[in-house]
Amino acid sequence: MKNLEHINLPFNIELFAKQVVEGFITGKHQSPYHGFSVEFAEHRLYNTGESTKHIDWKLYGRTDKLFNKRYKEETNLRCQLVIDASSSMYYPNFEKPTLEKPNKLLLSVYASAVMMNLLKKQRDAVGLSVFTDKLDVHTPNKTTQRHHRVIYHELENLLKVDAKASIKKTASIDALHQISEMVHKRSLVMIFTDFISNDKTLDEQFEAYKHLKHNKHEVILFYLSEPTTEINLEFDNKPYKFIDVESGEEMKLSPHLYAESFKKQSQNHLKELKLKCLQYKIDLVEVDINKGFDTILNSYLLKRQKMF
């Protein structure tokens, strides 16, 4: 990612995704990528007209039957990328977010594009869901080039939305219940969210995650934050006006007076979130939006290896 941070936005998301994936595969993460992508899985009967590239001729000599070697790269995976696009995801509220200074939504959009490109390389099916105060976008998981173009278009549209134009609260519960029923069973569901919901407890929110698990989905929850200000409340020693981006409520205060108690509250929230994810066998991945895509890509690769 570091070599691409100078690029101004908006620019071609698809091109960016290809560059990141190629760099990831050929760079320091080469071994784990190739480890799962070409690992032998099983034999399957050869069908007339197929390429003879993967025929196991030694097995043919023993059985007088044609079998193809099937690799784990060929084991189809269905993946649904889910993005929380509520108002809190536009934090930090930069006038023009960049890859060098992203907000949570921008990182989610580009991370989703990168993930889709990686899934495409593995011939896995991918779909996209986006929610705010309702389920705004839902595409089924498919493998076609035309479908990939549709998803890129939806991702680009997310970057064009003016966060100041309308306040969008989070309605993850209803959206995830819908997604649970709409996505093919036993899919991998990857959710990008900051887990900010003003009117719902974690217990209430996890009812939807329980639904995902009940329908045999594997879930990776990417918990995005800008830790310096969102968790540690590190600001200059002066009064600020804070605005709740999902309610519009305003409050004036001096952050340094509340930093310790706020940090403790944030840590307790994270601890509770970790316990909930552990309870329901959900992979929780903490993502510092200032540190790029490696954490996200590595988490996916490890999960895929475990699934197959």
Q: What is each PLM-predicted segment?
A:
Residues 1-32, 36-42, 51, 181-185, ...:
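Von Willebrand factor type A / integrin I
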Residues 1-143, 188, 192-193, 198-200, ...:
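An amphipathic, basic-hydrophobic helix/alpha-beta surface used to engage anionic
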Residues 106, 166-173, 264-267:
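Conserved phosphate-coordination/catalytic loops
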Residues 147-187, 199-200, 230:
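Von Willebrand factor
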Residues 75-78, 88-94, 166-189, 221-224:
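A structural preference for long, well-packed, hydrophobic secondary-structure segments
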Residues 66-68, 175-178, 206-207:
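A generic local structural motif
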Residues 110, 114, 170-177, 271, ...:
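Short, contiguous clusters of charged residues that form electrostatic/catalytic patches at enzyme active sites
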Residues 137-155, 280, 302:
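Short, electropositive alpha-helical surface patch
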